[in-house]
């Protein structure tokens, strides 16, 4: 899958202070982007929105998505949605642990692109 062409689009403000350490941010972005890239058909979108309620970071793709009845399960250590793709089922559990350690929350839904949308909600400070 590393040779496929993927359009990556960004919807980001010029500046935004995300309340998370650099290493933790890189770890969770790496896991989410790796999954999005691996499972997308041709497009991944990264967006960040700041509001009075806090900051929302969203990674979404145009892949197969995640069925609603599987969303909680795939965030557990050792669980994978699809055994046909490589992986150990650890990445999303690590992402969830990192996010929760910062008082943020992770939601998983449908993307307007047609695939999955992983949203990280950091509360306002």
Where would I find each of the regions flagged by the language model?
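Conserved catalytic submotifs in the C-terminal HATPase_c
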Residues: 7-17, 52
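Short beta-strand/loop element within the Bergerat-fold HATPase_c
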Residues: 43-53
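Short conserved segment of the HATPase_c
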Residues: 66-78
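Acidic ATP/Mg2+-coordinating residue in the GHKL
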Residues: 61
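Short alpha-helical Gxxx[C/S/T] motif in the catalytic ATP-binding
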Residues: 91, 95
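Conserved polar catalytic motif of the HATPase_c/GHKL fold
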Residues: 30-31, 35
